[in-house]
Amino acid sequence: MDIQRSILIVALAVVSYLMVLQWNEDYGQAALPAEVSSSTAATPALPDTPADTASTGGDDIPTAVAEPTAAAVAPTAAASDELIRVKTDVLDLAIDPRGGDIVQLRLPQYPRRQDRPDVPFQLFDNGSERTYLAQSGLIGQNAPDKSSGRALWSSEKQSYEMADGQDSLVVDLTYSENGVSYIKRYSFKRGLNPQCSAREQQLKKPGCVDPSAYQVDVRYLIDNQSDQAWSGNLFAQLKRDNSGDPSSTTATGTATYLGAALWTSDEPYKKVSMKDIDKQSFKETVQGGWVAWLQHYFVTAWVPSKDSTNLVQTRKDSQGNYIVGFTGPAVQVAAGAQGETGAILYAGPKLQEHLGKLSPGLELTVDYGFLWFLAQPIFWLLEVIHGLLGNWGWSIIVLTIIIKLIFFPLSAASYRSMARMRAVSPKLQALKEQHGDDRQKMSQAMMELYKKEKINPLGGCLPILVQMPVFLALYWVLLESVEMRQAPWMFWITDLSIKDPFFILPIIMGATMFIQQQLNPTPPDPMQARVLKLMPIIFTFFFLWFPAGLVLYWVVNNILSIGQQWYITRKIEAAAKPANA
């Protein structure tokens, strides 16, 4: 009995240690920034003029080999420094005409806070407190973007909005220089299905929100009417400062992973943290690939053509900003001819299935940690259940039942072993009284008793340990999946991804652990018995800050376990009565 309990306690301690170790390795970040005040009633509008930190050229722009040393680019007469506003049903963004970069972007379908649904989460920003933007351009001989300055693009309007009934929106920026005309074309898609109700759209019901609407197709159309050939390279990159992740407030108050990731020839998913970039830059030539910046629940990624050979790299500019991007192959346009190049920008939630379709390996940005091979099928099953029930809380309950059925034989073996141990508890107590403090003789006598009664002292422990990886995998599923963000269950549980605001579920969980403990055999060691009695209290304390969805899983699992264990225990005790008569 001592061996069984000791192994179980040590195993739980080891698992907890590994969990904390992995968490620190993957998610340890700097302290979070203070939350932006939302005391005003209306959503604050994006500013119409770019911040002073907007790029006008410098070491944040990659330098092409053939780039000439020239004076700063002269803007066209009709160009303006005023930001160009673009609004679709899922994106609200601003483009800086200097360089044509997306410097601000909001997600109207993802409120920053649940109690303020009118304030959308802001992904990109280029203000005095935070720098995070998506840059792209053309570099090389006679190309418009140089380290000495960026092109100043023109547009027909200063504001574009996708109208009702409109399925797409195209925003063209124009620029001309040295007989070459350029169009930088942003193409957007409608995301919300008008056949769905506003509530169904808000809950992200299947078929109500098109994930591809978070993709922005960025194309460069080049019309070379000069008398010489034109050559240039497309570059696209994400630039960010070292400010904290505004979306990373988790149930435990711990910051999740914030950093770059990219596809390489050797690794379909390579994380490059800010610390890694501080130490050294990274460069590699790949076929296709992608580059991304990760934060809790959301990801931005540049995806070039899968058929192109690209130089992917990470670096740090002189202003301390971190950059991850790629430079494409040279584009040649003969005199009097036209050419084009481009890439896809994804800026939105971490939607695993869609990201995998967009580019191989991009689905791994939904980072489930070292148990991803268990977490991915668990999430798939959870998503299937949600498609039938339409509520993530009830889906977790059904998932718990299914997992319990899968592990039913193992659990039954564990409970049978515990029931037999419970039945021989009086004999164990007698052995303790017989041998006193002689632990060696006590252990030998216990082993002989286990052998005589055909009891495996590890029988109640190992089945529980087998289930621990599933529990940890589910933990990461609930933590990392954006589908759980602000997902309600019922009554007071309005967000399954954060802690229970009234701590009701953790208290219920502690009560179920206490009840289940009464069904287990009492260890002969009084000190061990006292420690085990404290376990429900200790677990309740730690679970106070766990995601409500995870605590819900544990509560339902405990209730099912109590029923199963009670039935098996009573059955074995009933069978033992005639034998003892």
From Swiss-Prot:
Keywords from the UniProt entry: Cell inner membrane, Cell membrane, Chaperone, Membrane, Protein transport, Transmembrane, Transmembrane helix, Transport
Stated name of the protein: Membrane protein insertase YidC
A GO cellular-component term linked to this record: plasma membrane
CDD domains documented for this protein: 5TM_YidC_Alb3, EcYidC-like_peri
InterPro entries: Membr_insert_YidC, Membr_insert_YidC_N, YidC/ALB3/OXA1/COX18, YidC/Oxa/ALB_C, YidC_ALB_C, YidC_periplasmic_sf
Region of interest (Disordered), ranges: 41-62
Function of the protein: Required for the insertion and/or proper folding and/or complex formation of integral membrane proteins into the membrane. Involved in integration of membrane proteins that insert both dependently and independently of the Sec translocase complex, as well as at least some lipoproteins. Aids folding of multispanning membrane proteins.
Residue spans crossing the bilayer: 7-27, 365-385, 388-408, 458-478, 489-509, 536-556
Gene designation per UniProt: yidC
Main location, first listed in the record: membrane
Origin species: Ectopseudomonas mendocina (strain ymp)
Compartments where found: Cell inner membrane
HAMAP family assigned: YidC_type1
